[in-house]
């Protein structure tokens, strides 16, 4: 058995998990990583502890989904704006508009070389604050004399209520929440500042089919992963379990 002890910081964000796994020290048969005392009363830690005790150890992928995306208590991306000067990190669209404008030019070029389809879905996965899409749409607006024969619609796949709110403020003059009785696959809709329809979805499967460009900037590096480790010529999946000796911590253990 190999184990690594992990604690939760304020948002329990998966960078701590990655550092714990990949920057650990070998100590005989065990691996350990430097940790801090966990915060008392952390609701996400309590939730995960109860869940693991009830159903057994969880995969690294499930752990990442909880601490990053889906947990309504303290999911990292769910409740706060982590991007920009006052956030936790900065992405290239927040620094310069050039990156997004070049992608916009590429989209127009590919649309032309593809035969100038009568319709185009522009889909972005994990749009952040909406800065990249804003820069792309600025280019589309500049080339409107070329694109005026194309029915363009914007589709954003975003699970975070906070980030979708910021995206709507940056990209639209006004947006509305979809009503349950509408039975629409999107949960929010609006019109961009350049006059294009825009919709928000929780799942990529809900995005309409058709001639589509998919954009995913710094999206895949935050997707949940399954971690496996080869031990004595056997592959074992790394799971997250409760530490029986230190209740305020959880541990990473290899599984047969």
Predicted segments, located by residue:
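N-terminal mitochondrial targeting presequence
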Residues: 1-39
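Hydrophobic transmembrane signal anchors and adjacent membrane-proximal interface regions, especially
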Residues: 6-12, 20, 50, 178, ...
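Conserved Class I S-adenosyl-L-methionine-dependent methyltransferase catalytic core
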Residues: 39, 43, 47-118
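Conserved aromatic-histidine-acidic binding/catalytic patches
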Residues: 36, 55, 87, 91, ...
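Short, functional N-terminal and low-complexity linear motifs
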Residues: 29-35, 65-71, 133-134
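Class I S-adenosyl-L-methionine
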Residues: 4-10, 37, 47-50, 56, ...
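SAM cofactor-binding core of SAM-dependent methyltransferases
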Residues: 96-192, 201-202
